[in-house]
Amino acid sequence: MNQFLPLLVTDIHRTIRDAVVLTLQPEDPSAFDFKQGQYLTFKQDFGGTELRRNYSICAGRDDGVLQVGIKRVDGGAFSTFANEVLKVGDTLHAMPPQGSFSSALEPDRAKNYLGFAGGSGITPVLSILKTVLAREPKSTFTLVYANRAVNTIMFREELEDLKNRHMGRLSIIHMLESGQDIDLFTGRVDQNKCAELFKTWIDVSDMDMAFICGPEPMMLAIADALKSQGLEPDQIKFELFSESQQGRL
């Protein structure tokens, strides 16, 4: 359905200095029922030019809200507008949820999931892990989350809360470019770094499904590393984006 529908902005909060989480209220909630990992396409007029941008839903399916996370991109018209101009009470327009960055949920099975996120690529992965933890009570989720520094980690407090609430089911490995006590958790996530992680911290042979969202070179390197450990292509899900269309993230 290629139709834009109104969404009332009911809350805006910052998860880091240059990223906001928007809570949105549709006139017709049924039109915005979503699967974990999906995204919304927004349109907005800027000086007579219509821009369309995709932003991933960061809420879980059982959160009872529709939320997207938007990180400000240098020179990005929509992301700057969302971070600096948009206010509670404004109305945005978006198409109903789209995307297939998910897998079927099986409440009776005990599955092991692995997620990799780079920067704002956490938004769809957060939706997936929250939904899995809520709807597959026997399943586990391991998240490897790469950022430049501690103060650039989106949803850091929420992730810690989730880890405490689901003790033993959610593991989080923060990878930072610097400032980590453990060398393994310092530096970019590339194929060599994955090989080290898989040797000492993550048993890929136990994993049923992997989700990867972040810069394309990182995702391709991770996928190659996972395949070298025996994961099949249909066990690896991507959410790709390019520099010219960063809105999804």
In which residue ranges do the predicted regions lie?
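Ferredoxin-reductase
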Residues: 2-91, 95, 108-111, 147-149, ...
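FNR/FR-type flavoprotein reductase catalytic core
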Residues: 80-249
